[in-house]
């Protein structure tokens, strides 16, 4: 059934291979055996806004080393457009960066914008990968 399929919003996937290699690997493992559609063309957001309502969504955002992803800003602008484009949707996030910075700020910004657009984030919806992955050591120590 189309509405049961997980939609993965993967902006700016066309970045350098190095920038997206780790996130591609994570998604390949995480989505193994899951009926998912990866949306790489952010122009599709505007073309069929009804498509995302009531859906299961995964935002996969590669930030590179400078914390900038132009495609992500297209998603952010769409979410902030004032309509409930994600009404009834449930989401999660994977934010990856080649530096130790920007992942939490991006996740907060995305969570607020998506929530205002109608998307719920349940439990611990964020997987955050900094360059060194040291944040996983801290998380493991607190578990």
Question: How would you name each of these model-derived features?
Answer:
Residues 1-143:
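FMN-binding flavodoxin-like domain, especially the glycine-rich phosphate-binding loop
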């Amino acid at each position: 059934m189309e509405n049961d399929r997980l939609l993965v919003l993967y902006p700016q996937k066309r970045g350098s291979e190095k920038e997206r290699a780790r996130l591609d690997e994570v998604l390949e493992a995480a989505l193994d055996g899951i009926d998912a559609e990866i949306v790489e063309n952010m122009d599709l957001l505007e073309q069929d806004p009804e498509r995302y309502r009531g859906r299961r969504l995964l935002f996969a955002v590669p930030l590179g080393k400078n914390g900038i992803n132009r495609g992500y800003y297209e998603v952010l602008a769409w979410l902030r457009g004032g309509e409930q484009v994600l009404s009834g949707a449930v989401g999660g996030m994977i934010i990856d960066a080649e530096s130790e910075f920007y992942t939490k700020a991006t996740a907060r910004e995305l969570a607020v914008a998506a929530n205002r657009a109608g998307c719920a984030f349940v439990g611990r919806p964020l997987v955050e990968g900094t360059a060194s992955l040291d944040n996983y050591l801290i998380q493991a120590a607190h578990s």
